[in-house]
A protein has these predicted regions:
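Alpha-helical segments flanking ligand/cofactor-binding loops in enzyme cores
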Residues: 18, 44, 86-87, 138
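Short beta-strand-centered segments that line the small-molecule binding cleft or hinge
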Residues: 1-25, 29, 37, 89-93, ...
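Secondary-structure junction motif
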Residues: 35, 49-70, 133-141, 151
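Hydrophobic hinge/microswitch elements
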Residues: 1, 8, 57-111
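Short helix-loop capping/hinge motifs at secondary-structure junctions, enriched
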Residues: 12-13, 32-42, 117-119, 130-136
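Small-molecule pocket liners
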Residues: 15-17, 22-27, 31-33, 43, ...
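A late-sequence structural motif
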Residues: 113-151
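Short secondary-structure boundary/capping segments
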Residues: 16-19, 35, 42-44, 65-67, ...
């Protein structure tokens, strides 16, 4: 039995939700990609492009953004790590979308541009109803909220 988990917010899940942090999504482009000198990447520019789709549930956050804007890239589903996605983009095999937290501290030869309009994934804690949680789980959630607030 699982009491709680850290996740990105999913609308279809009927669990209690504790928001912790917004994590901005970025366009990941090859180093030689010509974005016309713009400092942002219009979401609609993904339309019709070879798009390397990250795996392990992150695709849900990305599909939400693409669907909201009616964008249909040529999705290539992958079962590889974020590092491999970045390397594939670096070598011109497509474009992708990843989050700031995934890219934090990396020194890759790709362009990482904010999306226009801005898009984020809301990170937090999904749990069974709070009234059903054991006291130590409620305390853990409170500590996590406090710790993230201080960051």
């Amino acid at each position: 039995r699982v009491d709680m988990c850290f996740a990105s917010r999913q609308e279809s899940v009927a669990l209690d939700w504790t928001p912790l942090k917004d994590d901005e999504l970025l366009a990941i482009l090859p180093p030689d990609y010509d974005n016309g000198g713009r400092s942002v990447f219009p979401v609609e520019d993904f339309d019709g492009r070879e798009f390397l789709m990250p795996s392990m549930g992150f695709n849900l956050d990305i599909l939400r953004v693409l669907n909201r804007h009616g964008v249909t890239p040529l999705i290539r589903t992958t079962q590889v790590s974020d590092s491999v996605i970045i390397s594939m983009v670096e070598h011109g095999l497509g474009v992708s979308m990843l989050s700031c937290l995934v890219l934090q501290g990396r020194q890759d030869d790709v362009q990482a541009l904010p999306l226009a309009p801005r898009a984020v994934r809301e990170l937090g804690i999904a749990s069974r109803p709070r009234r059903d949680l054991r006291p130590m789980v409620r305390r853990f959630i409170a500590e996590a909220e406090e710790m993230i607030e201080k960051m």
